[in-house]
Swiss-Prot record:
Protein name from the UniProt record: Replication factor C subunit 2
Gene: RFC2
CDD domains assigned: AAA, HLD_clamp_RFC
GO terms classed as biological process: DNA repair; DNA strand elongation involved in DNA replication; DNA-templated DNA replication
Record organism: Phaeosphaeria nodorum (strain SN15 / ATCC MYA-4574 / FGSC 10173)
Annotated localization: Nucleus
One CC-aspect GO term: nucleus
Amino acid sequence: MADFFNLKARQQAAAQASSSKTPTSKQESNRLQPWVEKYRPKTLSEVTAQDNTIQILSRTLQSSNLPHMLFYGPPGTGKTSTILALAKQLYGPELMKSRVLELNASDERGISIVRQKVKDFARQQLSVAPTYNVMTEDKDGGEAKMVRYRDKYSCPPFKIIVLDEADSMTQDAQSALRRTMETYSRMTRFCLVCNYVTRIIDPLASRCSKFRFKSLDQGNAVRRVDDIAKLEDVKLDAGVSEELVRVADGDLRKAITFLQSAARLVGATQTAGRKKKVVVDDEDEMDIDPPSAPSKTTISLEQIAEIAGVIPAPTLASFSDALFPKSAAKSIRYNEIAKVVENMIAEGWSASQTVSQLYEQVMFDERVEDIKKVRLAGVFSETDKRLVDGGDEHLAVLDLGVRVAGVLCMG
């Protein structure tokens, strides 16, 4: 009871209680962080395979004269990473929070967001740049030295609003955004990020400088995957990096996610049984894995195929064989097709993955004549649209099989 009035004794008791808990260390936090975020480019020079775009933006970075921008291209090519890296080099860590607003337009796509959140941020006065000194490194590898914040980061007199997946915005929201861009262009710059530039209305696109992000070539993507695997001390079998890029269809973000999933799968057997208790609060505890030791097991091609949901070659071959006529009568073997499709759906294979792999299997088969390939292209495109529209997967794949078999049986 006497210790209750002793402030020093109470502080010591609180310190001992907090030290008895096992906090999540910085190393633990980094281990649990998605590799996509962990290895996101911090500067423009770290962005891969977009040389022309990076060259133009680097010139803009030096002059601090930024136009409204429109980044478009396939997913996983570095569009969002590029604008965030540019903003970090312009403002530094202190001004990023107050000068940059990032919105995912696929979640907040209505006109109310443009009228409220975007407009409110655009009309805000600029925050003052810090006056203290920061540490900087010599580009030639010399010793670090202290410089003013404004000398390291240019801190131009405008804010940046990043609208990710802007092609998901409604027409009304895009029209409202056009007026907002005109009104607050003196102190705000907009960067629209999208996959399909045709879904951006012309009045909005004409106000922006367009930057096309091309799909990463095989060499750059494989090199980046190998670098991350080396940094994470993950061992890969021969050809695994190339397979990761192939199953990801050039999407580097997806390839890195597959790599992390495979690394966790390989290390699961090693970390099992070595879990430790972490005190979350005064009563609750949580089991977490300790930082895993360097993996002695390598990631194989079979594990990548399993994680990516790639249909095994024997399963796909049985489906394609059922589509080709066996006899001279050239009749559709419906029962065989229906049985194979039923088994594939029961095993849980994705219908979209089935369509994608079957397309490559059939369209690149030398036994199929060119005139038939023209008709098959229409069949595959119709099935793909039905799946996108939410059609039943079993019926869509069965219909695809029957229609493809019908084209192949034609004389």
